[in-house]
């Protein structure tokens, strides 16, 4: 696999070019990483309209992780969570009521920021009393998810998504296949914060 971004930045760092551009440290090493810290100079591509080395790197990552597409973000998973919810919200049922998201309670705070920014309600899926992992774990069973969806349906509300964190902060995994089947049966998208799961692709049976 090629490494187009690393190759470009290494060549630039070793070129001795006068840096008449941002950032202000001009590549002068203080912590050690500054020579590698550049902006959208010629050849460096542009993150949101990638056509060069970033596009090549994203294509490499797509093949590596076996995804349909891979896009790099400027703010890690928090930005990706907000983007995912924004896209899912576009398909929210137009009922005249505030959109509602069904979410496991161990969600990252980026979900709360998204709810404030995008103006939707959250209906929480709480951990079972016997779950010793408490909020850091919050496993969701097929039965609990089905019951929560049925309860919302009885109130005349259909969530625009079911939001889960898997793996969670303790390494626990949700049964994505089974929970996805429940969501499909109710016509509700399943949204997964998989920030801790990049390694899963490389395990037996990983995807």
Predicted segments with their positions:
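Conserved PLP-enzyme active-site core in the AAT-like
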Residues: 2-10, 56, 75-207
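Conserved N-terminal alpha-helix of the aminotransferase class I/II PLP-enzyme fold
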Residues: 34-79
């Amino acid at each position: 696999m090629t490494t187009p971004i690393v190759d470009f930045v290494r060549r630039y760092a070793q070129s001795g070019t006068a840096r008449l551009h941002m950032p202000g440290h001009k590549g002068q090493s203080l912590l050690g990483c500054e020579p590698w810290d550049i902006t959208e100079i010629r050849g460096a591509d542009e993150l949101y309209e990638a056509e060069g080395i970033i596009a090549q790197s994203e294509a490499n990552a797509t093949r590596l992780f076996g995804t349909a597409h891979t896009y790099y973000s400027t703010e890690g998973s928090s930005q990706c969570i907000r983007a995912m919810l924004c896209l899912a919200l576009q398909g929210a049922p137009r009922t005249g009521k505030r959109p509602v998201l069904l979410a496991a309670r161990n969600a990252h705070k980026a979900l709360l920021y998204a709810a404030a920014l995008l103006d939707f309600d959250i209906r929480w899926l709480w951990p079972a009393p016997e779950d010793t992992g408490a909020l850091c774990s919050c496993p969701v069973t097929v039965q609990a998810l089905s019951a929560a969806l049925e309860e919302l349906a009885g109130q005349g509300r259909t969530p625009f998504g079911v939001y889960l964190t898997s793996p969670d902060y303790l390494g626990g995994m949700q049964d994505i296949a089974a929970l996805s089947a429940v969501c499909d049966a109710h016509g509700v998208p399943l949204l997964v914060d998989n920030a801790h799961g990049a390694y899963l692709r490389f395990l037996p049976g990983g995807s």
